[in-house]
């Protein structure tokens, strides 16, 4: 059973026990096990932008988790709303929808310039990226471009941890895995500080746009 009530601090012995269990039985996202084995930070509390570890240290979480915690930690009003909905009905059977789902779709449409906007709700960023790519491919098929399977993205970008999302990232760390998604094409990442032709941001943007256009021409516009 997972504990849902975190104490302010844990004993040193308990922290070491948790670190040992984690080292033996967990993989951490975007981290090498040997880098944190035996010294893993065990968090017990979060409030706003602050998090606290089991040994009493307090840290500013400037990354918002892994860019997903923009609402902050310890938001009781969010927890209360989630609890209320989960005790009523937490999801809908296939082919149906809950009241909050429908209301949220309507709210998104109100905020979006295109009032005919539709929402497809998913569980996280990686799934959102993969769904967007599949929708784009389906749109191409329905509009007579059945051969448009290639997706152009920027090198050294991050789109998620699933196979398709990793393919789009264009990071060298994924190269040993071999080809993941056919048709994943990469262009220069717009970063005026690190590019070999670094300089004025406007000039860099124009060069990147020109490269993007050339890649489309080279690959064939009907395939992108």
Indicate where each model-derived feature is located.
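Glycine-rich loop-to-alpha-helix module at the N-terminal edge of alpha/beta enzyme cores
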Residues: 4-8, 12-15, 58-145, 152, ...
């Amino acid at each position: 059973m997972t504990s849902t009530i975190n104490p302010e601090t844990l004993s040193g012995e308990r922290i070491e026990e948790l670190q040992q269990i984690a080292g033996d039985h967990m993989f951490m996202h975007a981290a090498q096990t040997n880098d944190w084995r035996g010294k893993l930070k065990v968090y017990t509390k979060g409030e706003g932008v602050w998090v606290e570890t089991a040994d009493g240290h307090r840290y500013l979480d400037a990354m918002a988790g892994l860019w997903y915690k923009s609402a902050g930690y310890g938001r009781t009003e969010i927890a209360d709303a989630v609890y209320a909905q989960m005790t009523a009905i937490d999801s809908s059977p296939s082919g149906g929808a809950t009241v909050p789902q429908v209301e949220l779709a309507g709210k998104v449409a109100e905020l979006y310039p295109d009032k005919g906007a539709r929402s497809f709700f998913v569980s996280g960023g990686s799934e959102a990226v993969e769904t967007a790519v599949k929708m784009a491919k389906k749109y191409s098929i329905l509009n007579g471009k059945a051969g448009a399977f290639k997706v152009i993205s920027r090198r050294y970008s991050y789109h998620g941890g699933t196979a398709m999302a990793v393919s789009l990232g264009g990071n060298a760390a994924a190269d040993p895995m071999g080809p993941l998604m056919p048709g994943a094409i990469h262009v220069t990442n717009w970063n005026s500080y690190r590019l070999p032709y670094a300089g004025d941001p406007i000039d860099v943007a124009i060069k990147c746009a020109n490269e993007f256009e050339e890649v489309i021409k080279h690959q064939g516009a009907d395939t992108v």
